[in-house]
């Protein structure tokens, strides 16, 4: 009997799986997949829940993989929601709740497609599902842990589709063939405290750090590349923690976030930031220290067989030819790319992470149909 992806989405939304809680979501999926003949393994690392499931022979020449997550961000003020954020209620043509868009509907669609496919037309190959409970958090023990375990166990995917929401307005209009890298830089400027009436007796870290931030934010990192828009730098914090208006503080901090294309690496950008900080230190005498966190490098799956496979299936089911894009934030596809070609395609993501997150019910079954067609075409 075919799996209803709408009902499964609602059941998953009712699982309160706010990172790092599993909330019963992976347990539910594991029961469904095990009952359909998938070999399931829980790959939990450092208390983070993950699920690996494979139908077919280990080491098959052709193995199609799906990747997704069941963890969700916090609901915020629950009183601000029109409906129960974990109710999975269907009303007015929408399915409401935290994770409805990001990305329990996508997971439900590919679970349903995978089960129906292997039961109706068992392929000459394998189908693998990697589902994590740690995508919205630090993402260090989620998909990374699954891929580490797979490498150790001799498991592999030939290609992978990540079911994240990718479409801005209409189902079918966009797929992701890559993502920008992300770096957060934390600057700490240490000067000499003093009276504001005698600035020559102090070393003002505020002025020094402001000079550095101005230099960074006025610099064009690049003009974009073949498949990427221009890299961006945004100032996100600037703090002194100084309640006094007549005191030059000794300490000032600032944070910038850089979203970068394939013209850069995290290391090359960190080197540039260090050089700029050193220049300002030389000019002002204020020591400026940098601590950088690279959340992920940019990556690209060049247009080819996988993206064409996805595009044909999307067009056949929706009438739209999806634009291959690298826009937006980062995703777990950045980890998968080191193991096999990866493309992302999913629903419209306009309400993800918002109060009253919801997904249009009429999109969920077509998404399952797209995934099912992709599987059929891949193994044809």
Curated annotation (Swiss-Prot):
Its EC number is 3.5.1.18. Binds 2 Zn(2+) or Co(2+) ions per subunit. Gene3D superfamilies: 3.30.70.360, Zn peptidases (3.40.630.10). PROSITE patterns: ARGE_DAPE_CPG2_2. The keyword Hydrolase applies. Keywords: Amino-acid biosynthesis, Cobalt, Diaminopimelate biosynthesis, Hydrolase, Lysine biosynthesis, Metal-binding, Zinc. The keyword Hydrolase applies. CDD domains: M20_DapE_proteobac. The active site is at residues 71, 135. GO terms for biological process: diaminopimelate biosynthetic process; L-arginine biosynthetic process; lysine biosynthetic process via diaminopimelate. Zn(2+) 2 binds at residues 102, 136, 353. Catalyzes the hydrolysis of N-succinyl-L,L-diaminopimelic acid (SDAP), forming succinate and LL-2,6-diaminopimelate (DAP), an intermediate involved in the bacterial biosynthesis of lysine and meso-diaminopimelic acid, an essential component of bacterial cell walls. This is Succinyl-diaminopimelate desuccinylase. It comes from Cereibacter sphaeroides (strain ATCC 17029 / ATH 2.4.9) (Rhodobacter sphaeroides). The lineage of its organism: Bacteria, Pseudomonadati, Pseudomonadota, Alphaproteobacteria, Rhodobacterales.
